[in-house]
Structure formats: structure tokens, C-alpha cells
Amino acid sequence: MIHDKTCPCGSQKIYQDCCQILHLGLDSGAQLATCPEQLMRSRYCAFVLKNFDYIIKTHHADFLEGLTLEQLQQGPHPEWLGLDVLSADDTTQSDGSKGGTVTFKAWYKMNGEIDAIYERSEFIFEQSRWFYTQGHQMHAKLPGRNDPCVCHSGKKFKQCCMKG
């Protein structure tokens, strides 16, 4: 059961002490993400756990572009391997609006191939909470054979996820 395991977001915390609080607290407003990085990590975790309702509810309505809960449920559903957050920031504009960005690589395996979503995601703070708006995709380069594995196992890539 995931509740007593390390959270998929990469925080090294137990899921119930990490993203589960955000996943369960969203509807009640009891616990909301406090910054873009926390929201992005909780969204990655929601993808891993197939909590697509959370994905839709944390995606700003003006940027959904027709994305629906049903589409997310239909897939495809890759095997998520690991998350690397490369940078994160949030800023307040001169007009008082708040926004932020998070650059990350979300590694996955699908049809026997390893790849990553390498993205600079944009976030906006509205209605007292953070929302994902859009992402700008970049090309991800696979690690070298002797580099640390993308799943953060501590093994070399060639001895872990690269093996199959």
C-alpha cells in the first residue's frame, strides 16, 4: 500500500506525510500547495497514482484546452520511474499577481522504452491557491550507462532501469 511508502514525488517523505495531505485536502481547502514546486510534485505523484481528478482540479480552467478526466483515465499510462526537479521559483508581479515556474524531468517507461517529460511548467496563484497553467517541452537526453539511474535507486543506469 502506498500510504506507508516513500512518496513518489521524490521528497523522501512517507506519502501520507507528503502529497497525500494535498491530494485529500484539495476539496476541503484543508491543505493546499504553498508554492509551485510543491504543486508540481503533488501533480507528478497524482499521475503516478492515477489520481486524475487531482490533475484536473489543479489545472487552471483557462488552460485545459479540452482536457478531460475521461481522457486522462483512458491513458496511455506509462510506468513512472522518477522525478528530477531542476529549478523552481515564484514571483510577485508589479500588479500584485503571483506566478511561478518549475523545470523538471519526469522519467517513465512505455512500450519498453525509457523517456522523460522535460518541461518548464508555469503556475499562477489565484483564488488563494496555485494552479498549473501550461508547460514548455524540451528534449530530454538519456543518462549515460554509468550515470545514476533515473529511478533514484542508487544504482548505475546500466544496472537498473536500462536493463529492462
UniProtKB/Swiss-Prot annotation:
What SUPFAM superfamilies does this protein's entry cite?
A: NTF2-like, Sec-C motif
- Listed Gene3D superfamilies: 3.10.450.50
The record's similarity note reads: Belongs to the UPF0225 family.
| NCBIfam families (UniProt xref) | PRK01752.1
Q: What protein name applies here?
A: UPF0225 protein Shewmr7_1921
Organism of origin is Shewanella sp. (strain MR-7)
